[in-house]
Amino acid sequence: MAAGALRGLPVAGGGESSESEDDGWEIGYLDRTSQKLKGLLPIEEKKEKFKKAMTIGDVSLVQELLDSGISVDSTFQYGWTPLMYAASVANAELVRVLLDRGANASFEKDKQSILITACSARGSEEQILKCVELLLSRNADPNVACRRLMTPIMYAARDGHTQVVALLVAHGAEVNTQDENGYTALTWAARQGHKNIVLKLLELGANKMLQTKDGKMPSEIAKRNKHHEIFNLLSFTLNPLEGKLQQLTKEDTICKILTTDSDREKDHIFSSYTAFGDLEVFLHGLGLEHMTDLLKERDITLRHLLTMREDEFTKNGITSKDQQKILAALKELQVEEIQFGELSEETKLEISGDEFLNFLLKLNKQCGHLITAVQNIITELPVNSQKITLEWASPRNFTSVCEELVNNVEDLSEEVCKLKDLIQKLQNERENDPTHIQLREEVSTWNSRILKRTAITVCGFGFLLFICKLTFQRK
């Protein structure tokens, strides 16, 4: 009985009798263990509640648990912090709360930064933009790269977030950084078919000539993935907007990029300036001068015009007759690229027939269009500098470009002459070959005429550029 009564009491360890001594040690040991578990359970329960609150996005419960002592930088599975998880689901409100509580915006786990997580999050662009803006305001590095050397701007470009791309650049993100495969943000946008991202990156100074590790440019990546509009856009050499936003301050860039459509319709100072130049030359060459004001009012650049679909033409008030002229000109500009270096010797010999002649014809036709464009701009250019209504840069800039054009035309003329001599040499060798069956004289004469016309056209284009250069120098 006494022993039984003793078992029911909280006896301390180290009693008199052997029985009570054993029981007392056990009771004392169990008491300390139970007290330790009781101290841990509330913390574990809080952590579980915290995880659930983060999962369902319960901001008030998250704040309550943070007030109760949960660390804002506690880690979840795989070592993620609450801020990284909130960024991964693009929960801007949770991101703001955690940052206000002192969460580390520069935290990384296995080369995965919180900013990269936000840029690659699944959610609306509006929410992703808010998260990225909050992280950048807490000095998150916009150029930090993951294990594959991809930066936040590459993820944003890949996923088609135009405003996020612009915001990152405004905070110092490098546009032309390349990942482990040589992809830039522009390459990723071209690969995924994000036309607006491509246009925006070109405005921000993206280099469309940078090649991947396997020697492909963004235009070739777009063509390989069947994004023909983007291929045409990147293949077109004129770029009136390239790098226009690079010289703006961070505040100006953010203002330009993040304005609403209504704001853009009200303010055309910037857009009108950038649209002036190549667009007018192109329209003059097609006899579509009457469209200049319409396109400038709608902030349509030359690149945009050349990549429009039929419904976009109609939406912007462009008549079917004018559409046909633009589409015909665009079709003439699309010369199918022939990669001679990738072909075998036998294939090269096969290419040198009708397809090569077609290539020369198209080249000759394009030179003719360039001559017409220069002639039009010469006739339209004011003789008196006081008649120029828009503010121009220093005339030296124009003359230096004209000098480069003249040099390029001279180089082109030299290469065409080399091509002509080479073909003439091959033709003479074939004529002197006794085993060769002579072609009809008409074909030979026709080929010679084509080559002569091409050479004359190139020389004429160089002469016109030389006149244009002298005109600028006189001014």
Curated annotation (Swiss-Prot):
Residues 272-334 form the SAM domain. ANK repeats lie at residues 45-74, 78-107, 110-144, 148-177, 181-210, 214-243. Its main location: cytoplasm. The modification Phosphoserine is found at S17, S18, S20. InterPro entries: Ankyrin_rpt (IPR002110), Ankyrin_rpt-contain_sf (IPR036770), Asz1_SAM (IPR042650), SAM (IPR001660), SAM/pointed_sf (IPR013761). One of its GO terms (biological process) is spermatogenesis. Keywords: ANK repeat, Cytoplasm, Developmental protein, Differentiation, Meiosis, Phosphoprotein, Repeat, RNA-mediated gene silencing, Spermatogenesis. It is found in: Cytoplasm. Pfam families: Ank, Ank_2, SAM_2. SMART domains: ANK. Residues 1-25 are annotated as: Disordered. One of its GO terms (cellular component) is pi-body. Interacts with DDX4, PIWIL1, RANBP9 and TDRD1. Plays a central role during spermatogenesis by repressing transposable elements and preventing their mobilization, which is essential for the germline integrity. Acts via the piRNA metabolic process, which mediates the repression of transposable elements during meiosis by forming complexes composed of piRNAs and Piwi proteins and governs the methylation and subsequent repression of transposons. Its association with pi-bodies suggests a participation in the primary piRNAs metabolic process. This is Ankyrin repeat, SAM and basic leucine zipper domain-containing protein 1. It comes from Pongo abelii.
